[in-house]
Curated annotation (Swiss-Prot):
Mg(2+) binds at residues 493, 499. GO terms for biological process: mRNA catabolic process; RNA processing. This is Polyribonucleotide nucleotidyltransferase. Residues 559-619 form the KH domain. PROSITE patterns: KH_TYPE_1, S1. Pfam families: KH_1, PNPase, RNase_PH, RNase_PH_C, S1. Its cofactor is Mg(2+). It comes from Campylobacter lari (strain RM2100 / D67 / ATCC BAA-1060). One of its GO terms (molecular function) is RNA binding.
Amino acid sequence: MRHKININNHIEIFDTDKVAKQAAGAVLMQEKNAVVLATVAREEKMVEEDFLPLTVQYIEKAYAAGKIPGGYVKRETKPGDSETLSARIIDRSLRPLFPKGYAYPTQIVVMVLSADPEVDLQVMSLNAASVALYLSDIPIKAPVCGVRIGRINNEFVLNPSNSELKNSTLDLYVAGVKDELLMIEMRALSNKKDNQHCMNELSEDDTLKALDFASSAILRGSNEYEKAFAAYRKNSKLEFKIESDNIQIIDYIKNTYITKLKIAINQMAKSERASEILQIAKEIESESMAIENEWKFEDIEKALHVCKRELVRNQIINENKRADGRGLKDVRKIDIETNILPSAHGSCLFTRGQTQALVVATLGNDNDAQMSDMLTEKNPICEKFMVNYNFPGFSVGEASPIKAPGRRELGHGNLAKRALYPSVDADYIHTIRLVSEILESNGSSSMATVCGGALALRAAGVKSEKLVAGVAMGLVFEEEKYAILTDIMGLEDHDGDMDFKVAGSHDGITALQMDIKLGGIEQKVLQEALYQAKEARGYILNLMQEACEKIIVNEAILPKVEIFNVDPNKIPDIIGQGGKTIKDIIEKFEVNIDLDRDKGEVKIAGIDHNLISQSKEYILNLLHSKGSNKRRDKKEMPKFDIGEEFLGRVQKVVEFGVFVELKEGVDGLLHNSKIKEKLEVGHEIKVKVAEIKNGKVSLDLA
C-alpha cells in the first residue's frame, strides 16, 4: 500500500507490504529521486544476557548514484566511516523505544537504493527505519521523527537541502517521539565574512531556540506517521523477560552490606572497571542466607546494582554530593603538559581526574589529505582536518586485543572533529591530523580529546581562531527533584538519566551531543544544563589559556610552505614529460610540490626553509629559461608572406598530409584535402603560404 505524506517541507512516499515481506517490518520510502529500503528483522528466541541485542546497519549502494565501486573489488564491502556514523545516529534514536524486558536479537537495515544530491539521506533513513519498526510486531509506543535544522541569514531553516546546508552556519540534527527529544547532534559551521574567518558559535539561548524549533517539527512528524500507519501495525504477541524484583536480596544487602557497598562505590568512582561489586556478590553467595534461599549469583549481582544505583542517585539528589566527594558543579582536577613528544609536531597530555588523553598533532601537505567517496558527490571529498580517536583496553584496565576502530571510536573522533574544526581557518595551508590516544578513562574521554586537541594544535604552531574546550554533563531525575552534574565520570554516566556533551569557546557552542534515557526533558532543565556547562567550559578554558602561554613551539621540525603563482600555461613546464621535471625537483631539494593548474598556484612544502627557497628559485629560473628559448625560437623563425611561393621538398608523410620544407629547418603542412597526387618523402612540389597561426604554416598548391 502506498502512503503519501507532506510534512516538514518534504513530500514523502511510503510503500508498505510491497517488498521484503518476510521481515518483521519493511518500508520502501521515496523523497524526490532518493529511495531507501528500511527493514526490521528479529529472532524468535530471547537471549539470556541482560542487554538489548540490537544491531543497526546503514548501507549506501554505489548503483544508487550510477556508480561502480572503485578499487580492485567491484562491489560494496565494509561500510565507510560516514555509513557507520549514520548507523550510530539511527541506533541512538531508536534504541530508547524498545520496551523493558525485550531481549530478541534484532537487526535494522537501511539500504540506499537511489540517491538525490539535494536529499538529506540521514534524516530520510532514520524516518524510514522508524516507520519500519513501528509497522513491525515490536511494540514501540510511537514512531520517531528526525529533523535537521540549519541557520541561513540568522533564520532557522527546517530540513534544508544539501546545497542550502552549505550556506548555513548551523547543522542541528534532532530525533524524538511526540514531545520527547531522544537524540541531539549539533555543530557550528564556520565560514568567511569580509575575508575573515568566523567560527559561528551558537549561544546557549540560540541553541534552546533551535531545539524548540526542532521540537515542533518532530511533534508534527511523529503524529503524522502515527496517523498514517497505526492501522497497519502487526499485532504483538511477544513475551518479555520478567525481571525478578529480588526484594529479599535487596533488603538483606541494605541491612548487612550497605557499608561495604558504599566503600565499593567510592572505589568505582575512581575506575570504570572496579571489581568491588563482584567481590561482594561472591561473598553474599557463600553465606548461609543465600544458600538456604537458593539465591542465584546473577540475581545477587542485579540486586547489588539496584542498591548501588539507589545509593548514588539518593546521595546526589538529597545531599548534593557525588560518589567521589565532589559537589554537583565541580570539575575534576586538571593537569596539562604540552610538547612532551620531541619528534611530534605538537602534543598535549590532558588529564582530568582519572581520564587522560594524549593528543598529537601532525601537519602535512595537500597530498596527505583524506580523500573520501561520497554517494551524492561526483568527485571525492578532500578532508584536510582529521581527528582519530583510539581507546585501547588498558585505559580501563582490560587485557583486550587492540583492533581496528569500532563504532564508538569513530563516533567519539567525529564529535571531537566537529568541536574543533570551526576554530581552524578552512584556508589553512597545512593538512592537519589529530590523534587522541586515551591512556586512562573514567568518563568524558571525548571531551578530554577536544581539550587536548585544541592545545595540541597550538603546540604545533597552528593559529586557531579561539581555544575550544569540552565538558560532559549528566542529569539525575527522581520524581519532582533533579540534579545536573558537571564533568561526569563513568559511574554517573551509567546510573544517570542523560549524557550531554558540550564543546565550545568562551563565546558559544561549537558542538553538542545528547542522549536522553528518561524520555522528554523540560526546557528549563535543558537551559540550566547548558548554562552550567558554559560555566564549567569557561573554567577549563582559563586553565588551558594558562597552559598555552607556556607552550614552546618546536619550529625546527615543523613543515614550512612557500606559495607563489606562475602563468597557468607554464605549469606543464614544471611537470615535464611524464612528470620527470617535477620528480627531479622533489628529489633534489627534498620537498613536496602541489600544483593548481587552473590558478597557476605552486605550493612547496618541506622541513628546510633554505631548500624550499632554492627549489622556488630553481622553478622560476626554469620557467624563465623556457620562456627565453620560446621567444628566441619565435624571433629566429623566418618571416613569410601570405601567397609567397616555394619549390619545396617533402620531409615527412603523415596520416593527415605532408610536411614540406620551405627554408632550412622550417616546414609547412600541406593537408590531404589539397593534395592531387601521391607524394613521398623527397618529392619536390611547388607550394604557396596559405595561413600562419601560432608559428605554424599551412600551405596550398601553387
